[in-house]
Swiss-Prot record:
InterPro entries tied to this protein: HisE (IPR008179), PRib-ATP_PPHydrolase-like (IPR021130)
Name of the protein this chain belongs to: Phosphoribosyl-ATP pyrophosphatase 2
Chief site of localization: cytoplasm
EC number: 3.6.1.31
Lineage: Bacteria, Pseudomonadati, Pseudomonadota, Alphaproteobacteria, Hyphomicrobiales
GO cellular component, one term: cytoplasm
Record family assignment: Belongs to the PRA-PH family.
Keywords for the protein's UniProt record, in alphabetical order: Amino-acid biosynthesis, ATP-binding, Cytoplasm, Histidine biosynthesis, Hydrolase, Nucleotide-binding
Protein source organism: Bradyrhizobium diazoefficiens (strain JCM 10833 / BCRC 13528 / IAM 13628 / NBRC 14792 / USDA 110)
HAMAP family: HisE
């Protein structure tokens, strides 16, 4: 699976500088991270709806779209697939592959990365309340 995502990532990088009039990927890069995030969220919702409805074939199709849009967002943010695999390995080493790390105050070892200085800090969203839009 990681090979497929790596190939997709490389294809996304190659397509980002193509003509936005003919390349969906280039168009997403032209529109920026907000549009990329919106497309990613839309695909995630479609996967959830299809899963709840029991439409396995649609879940597969929409999951492929979700992974494509996630890969585009990764490329825009300077995240490489191997960065994600390294984090998954770190989590597996700590808790096992089937566990999600808690968001609590648990101190976790930092992963060394040559690009750490270029990344924006992660901001915790816990404790925030959702506002209704009118």
């Amino acid at each position: 699976m990681s090979d497929s995502l790596e190939r997709l990532y490389l294809a996304v990088l190659a397509a980002r500088d193509l003509d936005p009039a003919t390349s969906r990927t280039a168009r997403l890069f032209q529109r920026g991270p907000s549009k990329m995030a919106k497309k990613l969220a839309e695909e995630a919702i479609e996967v959830v709806i299809d899963a709840v409805n029991g439409d396995t074939d649609a879940v597969v199709r929409e999951s492929a779209d979700l992974l494509y849009n996630l890969t585009v967002l990764w490329a825009s943010a300077g995240v490489r697939p191997e960065d994600v695999w390294r984090e998954m390995t770190r989590r597996e080493d700590m808790l096992g592959i089937a566990e999600k790390l808690p968001k609590s105050a648990m101190k976790l070892p930092k992963v060394a990365s040559p690009r750490v200085a270029a990344r924006r800090p992660i901001v915790a969203l816990e404790g925030r309340t959702a506002r209704k839009r009118h």
